[in-house]
């Protein structure tokens, strides 16, 4: 491991560098901030800090005593006798000192060095002796050979040895002896040096070695049989020993061999040898030999290693997923997701359902790759099983009429249809989407009439989505209004061509040029001014310009080249739906492709069913409907939402499965969105007092009106009063609705519907507030007034009069009487007062007496003198002012 500096070490341990330098200095190590620190210096500092903070005060030795009692049967003649045998065991656990371990390691190292030196010396000495012996043997062999040669030569040719040859031989012998002596002396010197080194090491370490030998013998006497110093390993060994003793045998460990058992004497010799026979049988591999296997763990290391980096995975997320499921997919704990979402501003629980968008944000924030999946493959298969290879044909255009309220949209359509429709709408305004188709000389046109009131924004948006052409009706005498601008925005958002019908052109105050100018400010330019939008001047009253408008619609449709599949399975969109008491759920469907036939299986949003009956916009029964034809269908399982897609499928069972799946998913997604409790909203709700709630049960005739009213009522909510729609639905008011209203103290609102007989009984018995409406204006106004009554009242103090104290008199009954002159307003006896001294309020109370001359009076007007007695206050002085006031309540309204 690379050495680190003092400054880096200080940052790692969370201390200041100066403090760490001081601690090194106290431990006897001189360091500066830039110096490097080795591992040995770190260990030295750690041991110093442990000693300084009492780290060695922990017990180093613990002795446990164990006692067991067993019964031994001893034979005595023909009878046997049971003898209780008590076995006492004593075991001492020693915590080894790291310092002692280090010293023992150093001693072992030194001893090894001494042994190595001794071995080297003995080896050198042995080598020298072996070399000397070898040389002596070689010399003897050489001499023997020379003698043999000489004798042979003498035998062959006896020659007298001269004196010179003998002298040379003697000289060679002397040189060889000198070499042998020098080699032997050198070997002796090396052996003496090695012995001297060993002697010095022995003298230096003899005391320490004696102490270590003494400690070792004591440790063996105490019976510490642990093989390892690890705390966990020791505990495992103890557990293994206890289990072994329960099974009636000793564990096999690295312990000395047991001493031979003493021979049994006396009559119990055979009986007493029973245990020995069992032990010998176990040793031979008998029945209990399996239990003699060592159970002490060899290592306490775990196989798991902590990952060095976070694992990034591909997370597949469906439409909804719970927090626990998302955590499982990301291989993390659910608490990590909860923490992350709290950082993002949302509080969730482990079982809470998240929508797909939220789960995607969380997963991407935590570094994972998200794969969005569609869980319902059945739905995909059912909708994909359509008629193929069918040629598209021309179809009639679908035209939506939009505009501001009372600009004549329905009257214009009424003239086109030659029927009075506007008179049938409550208040003369359209509150539903009306779908009609009209046959002209040049072809068929389907019209959708949308409401113009501000509350019907969603209905107008649906009309723009399902349409091919938008006719924007603008009154020539009124100009561009808010809903006119909104209709332009809907048309632009849907990418639908716009035709402007300037209505009421027959009025004297009509100003079509003003309409063109105002519309040009919103991006609608007339063809006369170089734009792309057709402007037609019409009059719904006289019929002026109607033919030109129809021709313009058909011309625009021809340019668009509208086509659709005429034959095959139908598909369309729900433009309106309602619950009819006699017919059940009724949906108005605009067929967009294919042919819808009676008996078809229709999957419509969250609902499904077989088409039992079909009716056109005039109420006539029909058997089939082609593209661009609006039709009412009966037979659905429930009331679908306006805007849902209606699709004909082949199998009713599969349609039911898809509808149930959609309902479950819709419920989960709705719950996931409702449960989002953001932190900022939590803190915003922590205010003093409670928010007043107006509970409402809302029922309407059609789905579109229900949505519009609910949205308008929710917009009335303020910080002090909140509209709480506890139940809503399409159809008449039932007994269940009345019971719920009574239990929740809610008001019941019916829009174009009535309560049945059972509901009226509950309403009368419980005195439930029931209100019927047919015009949305009146409904919203009355709810606003009801909410105004729930607002906390405001109080205001009004000063009635002011009197100046001119003199002070004493009365035996009342006390101090102030003689005053009324300078402003009127002094009333019943009103509360304040006493002012130098324009500072010093007392607030009420009058006890008000007199003019000697008579008690109720009030005294401006400019008159009077006597005033203040109740429970006698410190009235000349120059004080007495102010009379009253508190009035100010009514509040939501328009404030």
From Swiss-Prot:
Residues 428-432 are annotated as: G2. Residues 539-541 are annotated as: G5. GO terms for molecular function: GTP binding; GTPase activity; guanosine tetraphosphate binding; translation initiation factor activity. Residues 60-79 have a biased composition (Polar residues). It comes from the Bacteria. Residues 254-266, 283-294 have a biased composition (Low complexity). This is Translation initiation factor IF-2. One of its GO terms (cellular component) is cytosol. The keyword NAD does not apply. It is found in: Cytoplasm. Residues 503-506 are annotated as: G4. Residues 53-81, 117-301 are annotated as: Disordered. Residues 403-410 are annotated as: G1. Keywords: Cytoplasm, GTP-binding, Initiation factor, Nucleotide-binding, Protein biosynthesis. It holds the Pfam family GTP_EFTU. Residues 449-452 are annotated as: G3. InterPro entries: DNA-bd_dom_put_sf (IPR009061), EF-G-like_DII (IPR053905), EFTu-like_2 (IPR004161), IF2_assoc_dom_bac (IPR013575), IF2_II (IPR044145), IF2_N (IPR006847), P-loop_NTPase (IPR027417), Small_GTP-bd (IPR005225). HAMAP family: IF_2_B. The gene is infB. Belongs to the TRAFAC class translation factor GTPase superfamily. Classic translation factor GTPase family. IF-2 subfamily.
